[in-house]
From Swiss-Prot:
Protein name: Leucine aminopeptidase 2
SMART domains: Leuk-A4-hydro_C (SM01263)
Assigned keywords, A-Z: Cytoplasm, Hydrolase, Metal-binding, Metalloprotease, Nucleus, Protease, Zinc
Cofactor binding notes: Binds 1 zinc ion per subunit.
Origin superkingdom: Eukaryota
UniProt-listed Enzyme Commission number(s): 3.4.11.-, 3.3.2.10
Cofactor: Zn(2+)
EC main group: hydrolase
Major site of localization recorded for this protein: cytoplasm
Catalytic machinery residues: E348, Y436
């Protein structure tokens, strides 16, 4: 056991990035064997000081000891280096002690980050990066020899640089952008990728306020409110500052930089995107942003984040949208020229309450974020479009997606549960429609059980009680039961007692199917029935008055035929309704699934072309799986051609879908 004197003489520990288990090098004792200070280290113990009596962490996807220390504020002083394709600089974490000097170390999550030095309260600190374990990365252990009194805040300053293995960042060359003039970068930290930007407590169970001080030669966007008065010109670069005063989890840390222009689209909103896309993006979104905000505020309570803006990213962005606060990061597939795909914005806006303000404590309870958000999204859209028929119409589409996801996994698969065990599981591997739609159906079932008028009173109560906090499924259950235990709801006692909470949380497969209002979908089903006859002659007028979503429901119904269309029918479908030439990626992708099921080889190259234009996983993964079944050679060729176009998260998932992970990793 090494005493205090030796510790005080040791100046700092430095990471050797080439080492699989990074070594601590002591400048005051360079002759000491590697890891000498850690030879007697055990988790929960530093120099004989036990933390065994502390409450356990409840997130299996973090290696941090956030039960002993909690990040309260984060300052990111980072330079965006487009030449080296990395972020470099320092991050300062202000951590509050949760014990009375019982913990003698801080443990942070990290993944493929080069750490150059760490200071504790401005003084060099002992630290070590431990060996990597999948899927959670390499924990960074920082000595706090004297511990800290309960409630005391310590500052940890980390000098660092990201590496080429960073899973949170995508770097685009000028050629990969529309105007071909400048490079572009953006981050995607959900689920556990913030740790590849900087060591942190990378768990949704910890929330921090943020200061962003970001230097770049191009415009910067971050998940905070811009502080334009403090932007500084540094010659070829500028320092951009943002503040996030509402505490957020690490997965909502977001950065983007490039040739970005902006335009107003509402009283509290602007759209940001490439200069070439600005006019089309502004047209697509203006007129709806204020409506979405006002509708959401009536359902929950006033928006607490100040601004609500949208950054429309290049095509390789892997999601429909990412609910980064202040600036939703959105796929360009929503800019379809017909305002048919902006439901995504209603969804991401709803996250301002469900997910961002009130957060699931771990990815095992992800449905609390997404199920609630689907519910709020549908309430928002129903209030704008005029009634429950629109709510049910969207829910019908969601049920179809849920059926497909569960069919893909299998009825008894762990990932078809609401509450999923994530021990040893990468949350990205468990990502699917299930937490969205199965979660929605649970929330909606509670709404129907107690009645809309009563449920509408519960909504602001729930979001008010858990604002700026994180919770698990059982805390949600307790909150629901607490609210409806009030005397005025005594007539609901028997109904509430009938809720099968355990079954809802832990049963695999589909939930009970509700009775949908099919009034907006019936016409779609009627047209689909006509396509079962090989003698049917289609006409563009069949769908001329329909919304894009009605066309999508029709296509989904055709896709479900027991007997696929013939090649001739498939080609007639694409031609008559203009699907293969559509600018709407939703419709185009749905049509290509029908064509592949029909074995229409003339459509396969169109599938490959679309896969080179869109990086959104909602389209990319199913299309690759479909193409792989009918033409594996083309699927592999298409993936290799576009490998660098896809975001690292998307690329990794497609590798698994195509069964090329091992080959790719060994090459």
């Amino acid at each position: 056991m090494w005493g205090r004197g030796f510790l005080q003489r040791a100046r700092f520990a430095q990471l050797s990035p080439s080492s699989s288990s990074s070594r601590s090098l002591l400048s005051a004792a360079s002759a000491a064997p590697p890891n000498l200070l850690y030879s007697h280290y055990q988790r929960g113990r530093w120099f004989g000081c036990s933390t065994a009596n502390m409450a356990p962490v409840r997130d299996p996807n973090t290696l941090s000891n956030y039960d002993a220390w909690r990040t309260r504020h984060t300052t990111a002083n980072l330079k965006i280096d487009f030449t080296a394709k990395c972020l470099r600089g320092s991050v300062i974490l202000e951590l509050e002690s949760q014990t009375d000097k019982a913990s003698k170390e801080i443990v942070l999550d990290s993944s493929y980050v080069t750490v150059n030095s760490i200071k504790l309260n401005s003084a060099p600190s002992l630290w070590e990066t431990k060996a990597r374990t999948e899927p959670n990365g390499s924990p960074v252990h920082i000595a706090v020899p004297e511990g800290a009194a309960k409630g005391e805040v310590v500052k940890v300053e980390i000098e660092l640089a990201t590496t080429d293995k960073c899973t949170a960042l995508q770097w685009l060359t000028p050629a990969q952008t529309s105007d071909k003039a400048a490079p572009f970068m953006f981050s995607q930290c959900q689920a556990i990728h913030a740790r590849s930007l900087f060591p942190c407590q990378d768990t949704p169970d910890v929330k921090s306020t943020y200061d962003f001080n970001i230097t770049s030669p191009y415009v910067v966007v971050a998940s905070g409110v811009p502080v334009p008065d403090e932007t500084k010109d540094l010659g070829e670069e500028k320092l951009y500052k943002f503040q996030q005063k509402v505490p957020i989890p690490s997965y909502l840390f977001a950065l983007s930089s490039g040739e970005i222009a902006s335009a107003p689209v509402g009283k509290r909103s602007c759209v940001c995107t490439g200069p070439n896309e600005l006019k089309a993006s502004q047209w697509e979104l203006e007129g709806d942003m204020d409506k979405f905000l006002e509708a959401a505020e009536k359902i929950v309570f006033p928006y607490r984040w100040g601004e609500y803006n949208v950054l429309v990213l290049p095509p390789s962005f892997p999601y429909g949208g990412m609910e980064n606060p202040i600036f939703t990061f959105a796929t360009p597939t929503i800019i379809s020229g017909d305002k048919q795909n902006i439901d995504v914005i209603a969804h991401e806006l709803a996250h301002s309450w469900s997910g961002n303000l009130v957060t699931s404590c771990s990815w095992e309870h992800f449905w609390l974020n997404e199920g609630w958000t689907m519910y709020l999204e549908r309430r928002i859209l129903a209030s704008i479009h005029g009634g429950d028929a629109h709510f049910d119409f969207s829910a019908i589409r969601g049920w179809k997606a849920l059926e497909e996801a569960i069919k893909e996994y299998g009825e008894d698969h762990e990932f078809t549960k609401l509450c999923i065990s994530h021990k040893g599981i990468d949350p990205d591997d468990a990502f699917s429609t299930v937490p969205y739609e199965k979660g929605f159906h649970f929330v909606w079932s509670l709404d129907r059980l107690v009645g809309r008028e009563n449920f509408d009173k519960f909504i602001p109560y729930y979001f008010g009680k858990w604002s700026n906090k994180s919770l698990d499924s059982y805390e949600f259950k307790d909150t629901f039961l607490e609210f409806f235990s009030a005397p005025e709801y005594s007539d609901l006692k028997d109904k509430i007692a009938s809720i099968d909470w355990e079954g809802r949380f832990h049963s695999t497969g589909l939930p009970p199917k509700p009775e949908f209002d099919t009034s907006l979908a019936d016409v779609c089903y009627e047209l689909a029935e006509k396509w079962k006859s090989k003698d049917f002659t289609p006409s563009p007028s069949d769908v001329a008055s329909w919304t894009g979503n009605q066309v999508l429901v029709f296509l989904n119904a055709v896709q479900d035929f027991e007997e696929p269309l013939t090649v001739e029918q498939s080609q007639a479908l694409g031609k008559a309704y203009g699907l293969s030439e559509s600018k709407n990626a939703e419709l185009k992708a749905a049509y290509y699934h029908i064509a592949m099921r029909s074995k229409d080889a003339s459509a396969y190259q169109g599938v490959a072309d679309l896969l080179g234009e869109v990086g959104r996983m909602k389209f990319v993964r199913p299309l690759f799986r479909g193409l792989n079944k009918v033409d594996r050679e083309l699927a592999l060729k298409t993936f290799e051609k576009n490998r660098e176009f896809y975001h690292p998260i998307c690329r990794q998932m497609v590798e698994k879908d195509l069964g090329v992970s091992e080959a790719a990793n060994s090459s």
